[in-house]
Each structure stands twice: as C-alpha cells, then as structure tokens.
Regions:
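Mixed-charge intrinsically disordered linker/loop segments at interdomain junctions
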Residues: 1-3
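Histidine- and acidic-residue-rich, metal-dependent catalytic cores
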Residues: 5-245
Length: 245
C-alpha cells in the first residue's frame, strides 16, 4: 500500500490552486496505482467545442475517484466490495425515484464521501466506546477533506456538496453543520441511507446474508429522525428487489 503517499498527495491537492489540480491528480494516480493518465488542461477543455474531450475529462476523474475508494477498501478485509455495493444501492435508489440527482455527481460523491477517513487514526474511526470531545471533533472534520478537493476541481460542485453533507441528519443533529433536514441536498440524503445500511450489514456480518439484510433494513426504517422520510420507501423498494433476486 502507498497510503502515506496518498494522504500526502491529497493534502497537497486540497491546498493547490485550481490550475494545478489536473497535474497533481495525474501524478497522484501514477504514484498510488501505477497508471499514467493523460493530463488534459481544464482551461483548454473549456475552450474546446468537442464534447468528447469534456466527457473524457469526466471519465478520467471518475476513474481516479474510484481508485481512491478502492484504496480505502484495503484498510479492512471487511470492506471488500463496499464501493460497488454503495454505488449500486445509491444509483438504484435514485433511479427508482425518477433520478432527481445527477448520476455522475452522485457517483463521484459515493467514491469520495469517506476519503477523509484515511486521514483519521484507527483509534478514532474504529472506536466503539464513547469518544472524547477532541476525537469527536476530528471525526466530524472528515467530510471536509474530500469536499474541499472536489470544490477545487472544476465541474464537481454538486458532488462536493453531497460529500460535505452526507453525515447531516433529518432532525438537525448531524455534522458538521447541524443542517435542518430541508437544507440537506438530495444526493447527501441518499448517501446517508445507503452508508448506514452498509454499516449495519458490516456490524452483523457474522449472521447469514438474509438475516443481516433484514436487520439492516429494520434499523434504517427505525431511524426516522436520522434520514429523509421521502427516501425511505424508494430505498426499501430497492432492497425488496434485491432480496427477490
């Protein structure tokens, strides 16, 4: 693993001017994955009339974001397949509700929403007992790392907002800004539900798959103050379809 290089590179990118993001991202991809992407200036892309060039840039970004998500999976054997599970659940939930959230922005946010956890010591993000005020403050800062990176990359404002808000809750007691439920962007509401579902599945991993799914969906439905109520039924419909197949 090249986790130290990844963290160092992300810290540099989070403070870099927008004009240097592309080169920094390409260098980081090569360092972490060994893949050498083609670097395209975003300023140049903005001047090109070819839609293919712009689409290529988006595809390159998504591949980079996905590589970071897969790197996060390596922190625990229990995380294997997590990225694809979250991606499928969130996109299916969005689609069954009529796709109100841009799928590309949602995909980017799903890949990066927990990237900031890489910056936290395991003593914080794996802690089971009550956290100290300092530990809680450290945990509550983690959405800002990936959101800050996305905000500095042209074209990812929507994803940045989703990442920043995915731990906000319907009752206004979430973090980092304690937003009221009506202030939370739609993509963040979806991510909050699928992320919680995955966490409960992980917690009950020793049970059979069917039992774990039922326990997870029961816990999600019981948390009516945590999640946006309008997204519970679409999510339930996705889970029903998953169980039927």
């Amino acid at each position: 693993l090249k986790l130290a290089a990844l963290v160092e590179g992300l810290e540099r990118m989070s403070n870099a001017p927008q004009s240097e993001i592309d080169l920094g991202a390409a260098q980081l991809i090569k360092t972490v994955t060994g893949f050498q992407p083609q670097v395209t200036s975003r300023a140049l892309v903005g001047k090109l009339s070819s839609k293919g060039a712009a689409k290529g840039s988006v595809a390159d970004d998504l591949r980079f974001f996905r590589s970071l998500a897969l790197q996060f999976e390596t922190r625990s054997a229990l995380f294997a397949g997590r990225t694809d599970r979250l991606h499928q659940l969130a996109l299916d939930t969005n689609r069954i509700a009529g796709s109100p959230v841009d799928e590309v922005q949602l995909e980017a946010a799903l890949y990066l929403h927990d990237l900031g956890m890489m910056f936290l010591p395991e003593s914080v993000w794996l802690k089971l007992e009550k956290m100290s005020k300092v530990e809680r403050a450290v945990l509550h800062a983690h959405p800002g790392f990936a959101a800050g990176l996305l905000e500095r990359m042209e074209g990812w404002k929507g994803a940045a907002e989703m990442v920043q808000q995915h731990h906000e809750t319907w009752d206004g007691k979430g973090y980092p800004a304690k937003l009221d439920g009506t202030e939370i962007c739609t993509g963040a509401k979806i991510i909050a539900i699928v992320d919680a579902f995955e966490a409960v599945m992980l917690k009950h991993g020793a049970r059979s798959h069917g039992s774990s799914v039922l326990r997870a969906i029961a816990e999600v439905n019981a948390c009516d103050k945590q999640f946006a109520p309008e997204w519970i039924e679409p999510f339930n419909a996705v889970i029903r379809t998953m169980l039927e197949h």
